């Protein structure tokens, strides 16, 4: 029986729109290469190969495609995919079926081997699993039946462009890293770049003891792992409103936790010689069909933790001019490395991710995603999961405190200014009064006048002092 692959009707429409131009296009099939929902794979997006820098037109045939560019783009796309997704294969749109042309098929197979060779060599960095024999190539020609094969075995695949939407769930746990990782000296330095694979292997070992638990059980003395047949739907609650419409709460009801959680280190923690300390809370969001087994979700989450940790550290190294670090370094994966931003892929509703550097914003995300994946994002499609509410609240409190301080300072300055103005005019009035008294008053009455004046001046001064005390 032929393997069954699911795609959406919108994907076929996309292929047809490319084919209608009568030109050659090549790209990547992104999705789930393995499922527990009765399918051998699910395609969730088709990302075309972008134009080369300074290039004005796309390649005219598979023979004109730069294989190195294909490999680099595949690695870049894999970095943007959460742990439940991978690069499943390639699609080719051309006036003729490339799988039926011996020469073109040979070139295509060579490109696939180069991609898989890099994936195999960097399987730990890319967090890739799966059987290479299942790598797909989809050939589409306008007016002809779509052909999809496992390129290595030449086995045809039954691909269905479904019109009925698939129900997806977004699982959003957070995984805390706070650990000293051993490093090997390379030359005279402990180089993170050269020890990255070793660090990730240690992290993989830690994740072997990680498991899913429900949020309501968090902190219990004994927490059982999920059962083999438990489904992801168990993590979501459903209620009906007054109109009878069923509403599903996507509130995260699980956590990924290790059996030996470490206490948070102090800011001045000392890292032993030959080690690097990684700390931070990694935000994970994976999209899975609603009937996916939780045992599979665990595997996807472990993969996502490794993939995002590797991506962050690699990007961190790339933006550092000098990759030589002291032995006491502590890397905060939340503040020292780029932010991870998730975005929704329409119309399926699944989520992919991207990494942005300090100073970049929504426009940077939209521009990068459009360039690499040919996805037009709406503002509501971008999900800033790595802006913790606690930090937002702290920032808000800080801003409010600063505003109040400025307000109080301004009111205090205003009070002192008013006091000085009153004193100035009181002094003038006193001088005028003294002049009038000495010129117009009889000396016999002068003592009485001065006494009344002193009493009035004292009353005014007491009122000004009282007003100053009442000012916040």
PLM region descriptions:
Residues 153-472:
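C-terminal functional modules of predominantly eukaryotic multidomain proteins
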Residues 1-88, 93-195, 199-206, 210, ...:
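N-terminal beta-strand/alpha-helix entry module and adjacent surface
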